[in-house]
UniProtKB/Swiss-Prot annotation:
Binding-site positions, [4Fe-4S] cluster: 59, 63, 66
Function: Catalyzes the radical-mediated synthesis of 5-amino-5-(4-hydroxybenzyl)-6-(D-ribitylimino)-5,6-dihydrouracil from 5-amino-6-(D-ribitylamino)uracil and L-tyrosine.
Gene Ontology terms for molecular function: 4 iron, 4 sulfur cluster binding; 5-amino-6-(D-ribitylamino)uracil--L-tyrosine 4-hydroxyphenyl transferase activity; 7,8-didemethyl-8-hydroxy-5-deazariboflavin synthase activity; iron ion binding
Cofactor(s) annotated in UniProt: [4Fe-4S] cluster
Reactions performed catalytically: 5-amino-6-(D-ribitylamino)uracil + L-tyrosine + S-adenosyl-L-methionine = 5-amino-5-(4-hydroxybenzyl)-6-(D-ribitylimino)-5,6-dihydrouracil + 2-iminoacetate + 5'-deoxyadenosine + L-methionine + H(+)
Family to which the UniProt record says this protein belongs: Belongs to the radical SAM superfamily. CofH family.
Keywords assigned: 4Fe-4S, Iron, Iron-sulfur, Metal-binding, S-adenosyl-L-methionine, Transferase
Annotated Radical SAM core domain residues: 45-282
Protein name: 5-amino-6-(D-ribitylamino)uracil--L-tyrosine 4-hydroxyphenyl transferase 1
EC number: 2.5.1.147
Pathway given in the UniProt record: Cofactor biosynthesis; coenzyme F0 biosynthesis
Amino acid sequence: MDLMSFKEKELSKKDCVELFEDTENFFDILKLADSLRKDIVGDTVTYVVNANINFTNVCSGTCKFCAFKAEHGDPNAFFLSPEQVAKKALEARKTGATEVCIQGGLLKEIDTYFQAEILKKVKEITKTYGGIDVHAFSPMEVKSAAENAGLSVKEALKILKENGLNSMPGTAAEILDDEVRSEICPTKLKTSEWIDVVSTAHKTGINTTCTMMYGHIEENKHLAEHLSILRKIQKETGGFTEFVPLTFLHENAPLHHMDRVKSGASGMLDLKVYAISRIFFKDYIKNIQTSWVKLGTKLSQISLNCGANDIGGTLMEESISKAAGGSYGTYMSEEKLKDMVLAVGRIPKQRNTCYEIIE
């Protein structure tokens, strides 16, 4: 395999599968990705001071990888009002956060107008403190809420944008293959529906991230197809701000008990996903984020030498990974994030949601 040709060449899905299957050139693949990272984004490693706000853990979804969900009436169930969400956002803003990531569940009482009320309250309460970027509602949440409100996705996104939605998390992607989705998240939106929601968001002027959850039942061909779909969307809309690989946290997830399911990804696969995504996307998607919550500090630092150039955020509150068995904490101070980056000889810089550097 002529790896150096991949530095300039646009990879096909076949090339991508071959890279995932290649065990002999593991370190050369990482080295190539790091070289591309340096060419495309330099030695700066970005981070965002942010807070996660999950406004409910009650959900009608049937995702088999989720350990966060609660049923109505469960002693640990909660549902925050728009005013309560806004107060949490204000607390985050007062402690220096420039972004809040707001997500909830799938319920009949959550429609587009409820989501818009959350946005409105957050924008109003933080205005005195310079405002805050709101990164909220997954494609699945947007679609479900639109249906509950009797709106099209396009109409719903227009309302959300008018009420202050700055960007959306590109979660609910998992693996963009309907055969895989039918096993791991049978009632979630189909691949074509996920594509429609994010593409419509981009055309409405709402940027999104994009994600891929791996290390469960997927095969290499599914990873290649997923990356190919994301690249195609980016070529058409340019609306993805970053790619975030999400390693499957298996410990508490119901999916873990299925016969075919792996016990999460190996450390080698984690690093390969970062590297191959960098080689595959090149500068179509310039920013690749590593997740210290899922990988831990040390593996995240290594991933910065395998294609990644962003270490995510301080989070302040992160419940979903913790519920699934994540053991790396739910908050990291800005100073610790900087130290993480400096320790591997790179330059830490704070950014906002749109990857603009905050001096």
